[in-house]
């Protein structure tokens, strides 16, 4: 009975969900990673990460997260109202990691974030949406944020195919 239950188990959406692979770069949605600890746990699953992060930090400190996974970070794309808190931790503990800041507060900024992440990525890298923050500054909830990420990845894939839609 347990075996059948495990086989039938489907994880909830937006929890380390593979969205697509484009030109050897994997895109993973962990929009549910709404705090630094959850983002840290998510990043430990991948060796080379382009991290899309930011939102409402709710008073969190990101120093431990950046210290722990700084060697995995190939790049960071920041968005959201408290993006500067993460940027400060990166400057203190991983100053050589390329960082792109998306200043728009509109949900469509995710398209820019995904494009910026792809520009930093190499084949074999993982673009990981693990924001470490709440979503309410730009999105209805973490599900909306994850859906916007998936849509932005689809937009990028279509653009790289020459405008074809899937």
Kindly label every feature range from the protein language model:
Residues 1-73:
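Nucleotide phosphate-binding/pyrophosphate-handling subdomain across enzymes
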Residues 85, 133-137:
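Short glycine-rich, flexible loops that bind phosphorylated cofactors or substrates
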Residues 7-14, 48, 71, 91, ...:
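Generic secondary-structure signature for well-ordered alpha-helical cores
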Residues 150-166:
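Short, flexible loop segments at boundaries between secondary-structure elements
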Residues 128-132:
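Short beta-strands and strand-loop turn motifs
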Residues 64-125, 164-166:
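C-terminal helical cap/extension that packs against the catalytic core
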Residues 139-142:
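Short, solvent-exposed loop/turn segments at secondary-structure boundaries
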